Every structure is written in structure tokens, then in C-alpha cells.
Amino acid sequence: MSTTIEIPAESSAVAKGKAPLIGASSSSYEKKGGYKKGIAIFDFILRLGAVISALSAAATMGTSDETLPFFTQFFQFEAGYDDFPTFQFFVIAMGFVGGYLVLSLPFSVVAIIRPHAVGIRLLLLILDTVALTLNTAAAAAAAAIVYLAHNGNQSANWLAVCQQFGDFCQKVSGGVVASFVSVLVFLLLVVMSAVALRKH
């Protein structure tokens, strides 16, 4: 007497239908990992650019001293960033921003190696937002003083100094432009981090 076990055709069809689903989910996971890794690599490149722009802004502003070639017995005409508290704040703030960006590079590398890590991406998003706020405040404040240096204010009897201190104004203007470049880079970094977290 022999015993035979019949396997229903439906169960075998279901079993056959499950195999492709596993492969599809694995393929989808790999595609998502490649997408996140691409974002992480672009994030690292943007951070390198932001480091250059932030430190360039601080260095340009910090070396903007100019002394006029003529002087009197009691006065020597010179202009420097340390004559303006706003420019002093700018140099300090951009120095902090540049230092943070340098320290964030290793975390960005970790995000490349582990593209699915949420903690690193969330930490960078929070710190990038703080640095963006500081960068924007410094750039906006310095831009207002640079405008006054170029154009003055007749209502307040503030004279434009850029006619006399051309090199000084050129350097501080360059520093402000570089700081706004880093603001734009930070905006891209924040948006990219938010997109990467949303796709998780």
C-alpha cells in the first residue's frame, strides 16, 4: 500500500509567484542605495566647495586693511575690517562656519560608505541648518555695511568711503560675495539631506 500526497496546483503557482517578488525587492533596495550614495557623493563635493568659499570670505575680509599714501602730522588715514564691529562679527562667524564644514567632511564620507544610515544624515541636516543661519546673518549684516561704504547715506550724513579706500572696499565686497556663495551651497545641502531622509 503506497501513500501519495497531492500538491494543489494553486499552492505551487503561489510558491512560484513569490520568488520574483523577493528579487524585485532586493533590486529596488539596491537602486535606492545607489540613489542615496549618489546624493552623498554630491554632498561631499558641495561641502568642499563651501569650505573654500567660507574660508575665502573670512580670509578676504580679514586682510582688507588699506592705508592711504598721504597723512598729516597727527593723523594717518587707514581702513580695516576691525574698524567695523559688523565686519569683525563676519570674520568670526565665517571662521566658525568654515571650521564646521571641515569637521563635517568625515561625517559626509561615512554617509557615502553607509548611504542608508539615517542618524548621520539627520545630524548633518540639523547642523547645516544652524550653520546656514549663522552664515546668512553674517553675510546680510556685512552686505548692509558694504552698501553704505559704497553709497553712503545722505539722510544720516554718512559719507561713502569707497572713493578713498578703493582696495578696502573691493576686498570686503569680495568677501561678502563669497559668503553668499556658501549660503547657496548650504541651501542645496539642506534640501538634499531632506530629500534623502524623505526617500528613506
Curated annotation (Swiss-Prot):
rRNA-binding keyword on record: no
Glycosylation sites: N153
Keyword annotations: Cell membrane, Cell wall biogenesis/degradation, Glycoprotein, Membrane, Transmembrane, Transmembrane helix
Record membrane topology: Multi-pass membrane protein
Protein origin, superkingdom: Eukaryota
Subcellular localization: Cell membrane
Name of the featured protein: Casparian strip membrane protein 1
S-S bridge residues: none
Family: Belongs to the Casparian strip membrane proteins (CASP) family.
Coarse class of the protein's main subcellular location: membrane
Cytoplasmic side: 1-38, 110-121, 197-200
Record text on subunit structure and interactions: Homodimer and heterodimers.
Residue intervals annotated with topology Extracellular: 60-88, 143-175
Function per UniProt: Regulates membrane-cell wall junctions and localized cell wall deposition. Required for establishment of the Casparian strip membrane domain (CSD) and the subsequent formation of Casparian strips, a cell wall modification of the root endodermis that determines an apoplastic barrier between the intraorganismal apoplasm and the extraorganismal apoplasm and prevents lateral diffusion.
Biological process terms in GO annotation: cell wall modification; cell-cell junction assembly
